[in-house]
């Protein structure tokens, strides 16, 4: 049985986020606003079905998917692109590949203790985020 990501997570670390957004061609005003936010993550997992809600005072983003099945992801509100996304298990980690206009786009997510780690990648730029489980 894979690890269970279910829970409510508060952001502790947001390293290199503005550079990540720049690599996605997000305009400077939105980058500055987004860099000030400390979004929470609410994750509901039922086997290989996952709903990941990224919640902030500025904008919310919901990702609803089945692990191992490719789907079209609408990134309106992030960088206004669509991509074909596949999330797969790699041991106890979730690996995401987002195929679209930007090369090398995706993320890896895993748990260490009571912390959720998220590494987002695009065109060689890496953003590292850490969240603490609060419930």
UniProtKB/Swiss-Prot annotation:
Question: What would changing residue 41 to L do, according to UniProt?
Answer: Strongly decreased affinity for retinol. Further decrease in affinity for retinol
SUPFAM superfamilies found in the cross-reference section: Lipocalins
Q: Which GO terms describe its molecular function?
A: all-trans-retinol binding; fatty acid binding; retinal binding; retinoid binding
The record's listing under InterPro entries reads:
Calycin, CRBP1, Fatty_acid-bd, ILBP, Lipocln_cytosolic_FA-bd_dom
The residues that hold all-trans-retinol are 41, 63, 109
- Offer one example of a GO biological process linked to this entry: vitamin A metabolic process
Any idea where this protein resides?
A: Cytoplasm; Lipid droplet
Q: PROSITE patterns from the entry?
A: FABP (PS00214)
Q: Tell me, in one coarse class, where this protein mainly resides.
A: cytoplasm
Q: Which GO terms describe its cellular component?
A: cytosol; lipid droplet; nucleoplasm; nucleus
Q: In which tissues has expression of this protein been reported? A: Detected in nearly all the tissues with higher expression in adult ovary, pancreas, pituitary gland and adrenal gland, and fetal liver.
Q: Does the keyword Transport apply?
A: yes
Where is region (Important for interaction with STRA6) located?
Answer: 22-32
Q: What is the effect of changing residue 31 to A?
A: No effect on retinol binding. Abolishes interaction with STA6 and the ability to enhance STA6-mediated vitamin A uptake
Report the outcome of residue 22 to A: No effect on retinol binding. Abolishes interaction with STA6 and the ability to enhance STA6-mediated vitamin A uptake
Similarity-based family: Belongs to the calycin superfamily. Fatty-acid binding protein (FABP) family.
Q: How does it assemble?
A: Interacts (only as retinol-free apoprotein) with STRA6.
- Function according to Swiss-Prot or TrEMBL: Cytoplasmic retinol-binding protein. Accepts retinol from the transport protein STRA6, and thereby contributes to retinol uptake, storage and retinoid homeostasis.
Q: Share the domain note from the entry.
A: Forms a beta-barrel structure that accommodates hydrophobic ligands in its interior.
Under which name does UniProt file this protein? Answer: Retinol-binding protein 1
Q: Which organism is it from?
A: Homo sapiens (Human)
Q: What is the lineage of its organism?
A: Eukaryota, Metazoa, Chordata, Craniata, Vertebrata
Gene name, per UniProt, is RBP1
């Amino acid at each position: 049985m894979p690890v269970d990501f279910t829970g409510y997570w508060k952001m502790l670390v947001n390293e290199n986020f503005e550079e990540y957004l720049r690599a996605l061609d997000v305009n400077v005003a939105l980058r500055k606003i987004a860099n000030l936010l400390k979004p929470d993550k609410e994750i509901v997992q039922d086997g290989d079905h996952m709903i990941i809600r990224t919640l902030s005072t500025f904008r919310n983003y919901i990702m609803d998917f089945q692990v191992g099945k490719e789907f079209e992801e609408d990134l309106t509100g992030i960088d206004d692109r669509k991509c074909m996304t596949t999330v797969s298990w790699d041991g106890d980690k979730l690996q995401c590949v987002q195929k679209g206009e930007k090369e090398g786009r995706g993320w890896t997510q895993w748990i260490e203790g009571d912390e959720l780690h998220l590494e987002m990648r695009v065109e060689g730029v890496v953003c590292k985020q850490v969240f603490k489980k609060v419930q």
